[in-house]
Amino acid sequence: MARIATESRTTGETKIQVTLNLDGSGKAQVDTGVGFLDHMLDQIARHGGMDLEIEACGDQHIDDHHTVEDVGITMGQAFRQAIGDRRGITRFGHAYVPLDEALSRVVVDLSNRPSLSWRVKFPTQKVGNFDTELFKEWFAAFAQQGGITMHVESLYGENSHHIAESCFKALARALRSACAVDATLGGVAPSTKGTLSD
């Protein structure tokens, strides 16, 4: 069964469409109008082994907040649809990813009990024109809508770009592990409850 989903979101602030294939080859076509976010989402596709298409436009004459958050929301909704009832998946995943002097760790549980633990500090308020406080907004929106328990931690780092990119790459690798099908489960949900869809 193909694990592919398309979701869209239209509000007075943004218009977004996301297509996500969990079993892709790492291809990305992303145009959010926010250059650094595009760069980070390309990392999700490339290192997560997913195919990702995103078209977004938002009220960036105000700032990038609505676009960043709503892309996270819509991508999370697409992830939830693509992963389906979560039967037979590995469920848990973690990754440590370095980028030069920075090292980050991400741990995920595809539990359908969304939450975000965020322990990331940036030494600067911006990466280029991108507000670093918006990284947490994207991760929170994606985790909430995707039904993911997520722990994101920057263990150390000095460069804000490197810290952010190592977090996104670590998320990609953690999701890749958690989404993998575990043949030993025989299609059963990896939970003593017998389900992860409720």
Swiss-Prot record:
* Alphabetical UniProt keywords: Amino-acid biosynthesis, Cytoplasm, Histidine biosynthesis, Lyase
Any single biological process term in GO: L-histidine biosynthetic process
Q: What GO MF annotations does this protein's record show?
A: imidazoleglycerol-phosphate dehydratase activity
- EC number, as in UniProt: 4.2.1.19
The record's SUPFAM superfamilies line, in alphabetical order, gives: Ribosomal protein S5 domain 2-like
The catalytic activity, as recorded, is:
D-erythro-1-(imidazol-4-yl)glycerol 3-phosphate = 3-(imidazol-4-yl)-2-oxopropyl phosphate + H2O
* GO annotation, cellular component aspect: cytoplasm
**UniProt cross-references to PANTHER family, sorted A to Z:** IMIDAZOLEGLYCEROL-PHOSPHATE DEHYDRATASE, IMIDAZOLEGLYCEROL-PHOSPHATE DEHYDRATASE HIS7
Write the protein's name.
Imidazoleglycerol-phosphate dehydratase
Organism equals Magnetococcus marinus (strain ATCC BAA-1437 / JCM 17883 / MC-1)
